[in-house]
Amino acid sequence: MKYKGTMLVVKDIEKSKEFYTKVLGLRVISDFGANATFTGGVSVQTEASWMEFTKCDASFFSYQGNDVELYFEEENFEAFCGKLSEQGVSLIGESATMPWGQKVVRFYDPDRHIIEVGEDLAVMMKRLHAEGLTVDELVEKTFMKKGIIERMLKG
């Protein structure tokens, strides 16, 4: 078996396509009207078509379940956070720095699915190293193997 991607049920597919392309920078690679697939393996399907395929009614859906998230990484994290603010995206709390040093921000898409965007790990490693952490300190802080960290710092 091979995992192929995530499909989100959405109320307004046009609004979702606009969000995922403009806010997250994904590209639509397939558009079948009631279903669209983006780069990165994310797809959206209209609620109406999903109900037709599964024989479920509208009471089946529970948006903003807050129990799963899509995760992305961004090389220019600060600029991305500025873009979220400009677009009026609904944040979940504030951006934060995780205990291992990675900056993250969480927010909702138009159907209240959670999106998390983290600072690219190689960018994080270079930032922490520039702030004075040694490779051994990075191993301790991030729980990553020394060889991986060294490759990230060289890349």
What are these regions (language model features)?
Residues R27-Q64, I114-E119:
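Conserved short beta-strand elements that form part of the metal-binding/catalytic scaffold
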Residues I13, G65-I114, E131, K141-G147, ...:
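Vicinal oxygen chelate
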